Amino acid sequence: MSNQIETRYLSQSADPDVELRLETRDDGRPVIVGMAPPWNKWSVDLGGFKERFMPGAFRKYLDRAPNDPRGKADVVAKYNHQDSAVLGRTTNGTLDIQETDKGLVFRATPPVGTPTTAEVVPLIRDRYI
């Protein structure tokens, strides 16, 4: 089995069922909320292949217990997959991921005062992305 990480881009223009919006916490901090991938739906062409995700596809990974020898699942939400552009992380409580009947829903609270947050929040709020 390969340890290589596969990445996918969230694209509302390529898939109208993909959801991305901005909410605001009571303390004024932005929260990025989205749903991707939707279940049971073929993707756009990803370079000679298509994929679809079935309900439960991520359950084993997301449900890993803290005492699992592999460690608790550490999922990191990044803007354009850049390591320096972190929007949220499950292990520090700034990213929550849940499987729903429609797809994988995430809620990311980006860090305060970073260039990434300053760039991404207005783009989502104004529906550029």
Protein language model regions, located:
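Signature of dsDNA virion morphogenesis modules
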Residues: 1-129
